[in-house]
A protein has these predicted regions:
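Terminal targeting signals and extreme-terminal segments of soluble enzymes
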Residues: 1-168
Length: 168
């Protein structure tokens, strides 16, 4: 294993540890971007390349029929893909370069849903990922896939994880 691979693996372990410290808690207390805090999801499970989140569908997330808005579904899955990508341990934050969504079901205001992000393939520059929204009965609401480009941008929560490792 190269020195770079070891560095990536250690950062992955730190990110997973940080996310596990927030497991079951509302994300509003996490050093996340404003949109993530607004979604106010909870981390249910996390491992390298995979994360499961849960959130309550609120009125401001609905379309005129009282169902989870399609644009919101895209945003939730993109956010899940983004935060899941940080478990890979790369120094920079991967950004979406495309995104495809299939809307397959519906969920009402007041219901909880789970969002599952997974890495399908890690390339040298591009990461292919998927996300699914499922209701609490396991019914698939939406499925999406995205390709992400590795960048040099370091988000605040990666900086927090890196600082935590310096304290020990």
């Amino acid at each position: 294993m190269s020195q770079l691979d070891r560095k990536i693996l250690k950062r992955s372990e730190r990110m997973i540890k940080l996310f596990n410290e927030y497991k079951g808690r509302e994300i509003k207390d996490f050093p996340a971007p404003p949109f993530s805090k607004w979604l106010n999801y909870k981390i249910i499970s996390v491992k390298r390349g995979e994360m499961e989140l849960e959130f309550l569908v609120r009125e401001e997330m609905a379309n005129p029929t009282g169902l989870l808005h399609g644009g919101m579904q895209c945003g939730v899955m993109d956010d899940c893909i983004g935060i899941t990508s940080t478990t890979l341990g790369y120094e920079g934050f991967p950004i979406s370069i495309d995104f495809h969504v299939d809307f397959l079901g519906k969920v009402k205001v007041g219901e909880k849903v789970r969002v599952i992000g997974k890495v399908i393939r890690e390339g040298r520059n591009i990461i292919h990922m998927t996300a699914e929204i499922i209701d609490m009965k396991g019914k698939l609401i939406a499925a999406g896939n995205s390709n992400l480009l590795k960048t040099n941008f370091i988000p605040d929560y990666v900086k927090v994880a890196d600082e935590m490792s310096k304290d020990k």
